From Swiss-Prot:
Catalytic activity entry: L-aspartate + H(+) = beta-alanine + CO2
Pathway where this protein functions: Cofactor biosynthesis; (R)-pantothenate biosynthesis; beta-alanine from L-aspartate: step 1/1
Residue positions, PTM Pyruvic acid (Ser): S25
Organism for this UniProt entry: Exiguobacterium sibiricum (strain DSM 17290 / CCUG 55495 / CIP 109462 / JCM 13490 / 255-15)
Protein name (record): Aspartate 1-decarboxylase
Length: 127
């Protein structure tokens, strides 16, 4: 049996662009993708801490070191520049893989630079 677990998370990212007329997806600084192991075209879930919106889309690479977080296409209607978001990717794991699974979590600052890397999420933690 496979179970679905979070494998990567960009926490407290800030939206830098919203492009309604792009075909779709979310553009993410390639350095951030690499830091947590999200691949180009991988399915991601994006939640908006300002308005509660939650969407699923796929990641595309943005310029390295740019800090870009750009919601493209219809998602641009739910995300504004400056909104704080959480970007998560999931993996399907076997029971054997679950025992050793460690998600990668990057906590970002207001410029979308990595402030802290976590190997686990601690219950009731406020960052």
């Amino acid at each position: 049996m496979l179970r679905t677990f979070m494998h990567a998370k960009l926490h407290k990212a800030r939206v830098t662009e919203a492009n309604l007329h792009y075909v779709g997806s979310i553009t993410i600084d390639e350095d951030l993708l690499d830091a947590v192991g999200i691949l180009e075209n991988e399915k991601v879930q994006v939640t908006n801490n300002q308005n509660g919106a939650r969407i699923e889309t796929y990641a595309i690479k943005g310029a390295r070191g740019s800090g870009v977080i750009c919601l493209n296409g219809a998602a641009a209607r739910h995300f504004q520049i400056g909104d704080e978001v959480i970007i998560m990717a999931y993996a399907q794991l076997t029971n054997e893989e679950i025992a050793t699974h460690v998600p990668k979590v990057a906590v970002l600052d207001q410029e979308n630079s990595i402030k802290q890397m976590l190997s686990q999420e601690i219950a009731h933690t406020i960052l």
